[in-house]
């Protein structure tokens, strides 16, 4: 079988310790509806971001989740589906689009 990669424009954000401050609007809206939750840990009395979890509410995927760690990317495709892509894979699969 022969396969061809589907090229499409996507929106992406990299998970960093300051994701709360740099998150785009679509990411913030998903956080407000609790589809995306920021994972935090308390270390030596300070709370730090360790990643985030994406929860699926559709009946077909009820109870499913994706976990992203610091450095991973959350990718939103043209249909609105979210996916987690590791940094090495993201650099290989996606190129920054010129504005």
Q: What are the language-model segments listed below?
A:
Residues 1-59, 63:
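N-terminal non-globular leader segments, chiefly Sec-dependent signal peptides
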Residues 60-99:
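Short, compact, well-ordered microdomains
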